[in-house]
Amino acid sequence: MNLVLLSGGSGQRLWPLSNDIRSKQFIKIFHREDGELESMVQRVYRQIKAVDTDATVTIATSKSQVSAIHNQLGEEVGISVEPCRRDTFPAIALAAAYLKDVQGVGEEESVVVCPVDPYVENDYFEALKALGDRAAVSSANLVLMGIEPTYPSEKYGYIIPIGKEQVSKVSMFKEKPTQEVAKDYIAKGALWNGGVFAFKLGYVLNRAHELIDFVDYDDLFNKYDTLNKISFDYAVVEHESEIEVMRFAGTWKDLGTWNTLTEAMDSHAIGEALFNEKCENVHVVNELDVPILCMGLKDVVVSASPEGILVSDKEQSSYIKPFVNTLDHRVMFAEKSWGSFKVIDIDNASMTIKVTLNAGHRMNYHSHQHRDEVWTVIAGEGKTIVDGMEQNVKAGDVITMSAGCRHTIIAETELKLIEVQLGEAIDVHDKQKFELEY
């Protein structure tokens, strides 16, 4: 199975846990069988491999999410990196070119495209495999997944099939309707459009070449910022007459708001939280190092992270986006390919950050033009390289780097340090990377 997972969005509806770097698919809220927490993307990737160990998985995403993907899934997963956001058709076209020119997938092979963050069980991925198998032999150019609706939703588009068979031709598509119109659609056998497409790779590449002047993957990547923003539905689906839909009746949820997300949580608290006996239907997600105490609350979600604190009625939590848009969006926590960082304090001429490096990983070898840095190791062991000079470090060691100094740190065990940045103009873009043979 060749599977492309679309991973985008800034996830403002799940503030304060999500931001421009950490979208909802990277938030760790699900318990695995061993008790450890996993994110939506980790859960989905695990389920895919449980169904098809040989599945080729490519994640189409923006540059800002690459580090988080490597942190959570490892370095082996394929990533088609969008230089900028251009909606789903350019993203799928770039991923298709990546599959052909980088991964070596043949044009007659089938490809399935789906969102990275559905809340589903393994039968969903078994259905995706069947969808890809159907696309490989069908005379239709596109095979879509239609979700059997469980209620008349206003949040989804609808697919109207010609018949009621497991696989049938598509009669028409309908945009997100009112609840009353949705009831009428469902009575006529309509299915939710889950944003899942299957096709032969050559079909989408041919369509991409018709709409975009490019030679190969590298050429398309280099001119990506000149492409028009357009969805796959508008660019391809609406102009295709040979389309089939395959029904799916299993569990399928879009966890796009705090209300729907808490419905899928298997415990009322993640992180340190305490409830009195008067609390009813209350969920807490706490990423801070201090406890949250809830007394006499009903139908409430409480979420706390370095980005901020949300206390909301669950129904009202669906409407937080315009309020979040008014807030300062400085990133206070992020996962990197080598570990993670959390901003502890910001002052006029300094910033203090807690950094965690995973064992066997290191930062880029880099320098800053406008700031000095001081590292204080608080746990673990490793090695620093400062202007080519190596030094073993452990808890209690302090390393000072002046502006212009090239430096990195390598973690031999999990390593934690406090980084203090000092300067009048502290800027995330003040960073120059260098090659390091190590």
Give, region by region, the residue ranges found by the protein language model.
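Conserved N-terminal catalytic core of the sugar/cofactor nucleotidyltransferase
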Residues: 1-5, 15-20, 30-113, 119-126
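Catalytic metal- and UDP-sugar-binding loop of GT-A-like glycosyltransferases, i.e.
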Residues: 6, 114, 377, 420
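Short N-terminal binding/cap micro-motifs at the start of the first secondary-structure element
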Residues: 11-16, 23, 428
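Residue-level signal for inorganic ion chemistry
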Residues: 41, 95, 117, 159, ...
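Conserved core of the sugar-phosphate nucleotidyltransferase
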Residues: 121-216, 223-224, 244
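Left-handed beta-helix
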Residues: 201-400, 405-411, 425-426, 431-437
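C-terminal structural segments of small proteins and small subunits
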Residues: 418-426
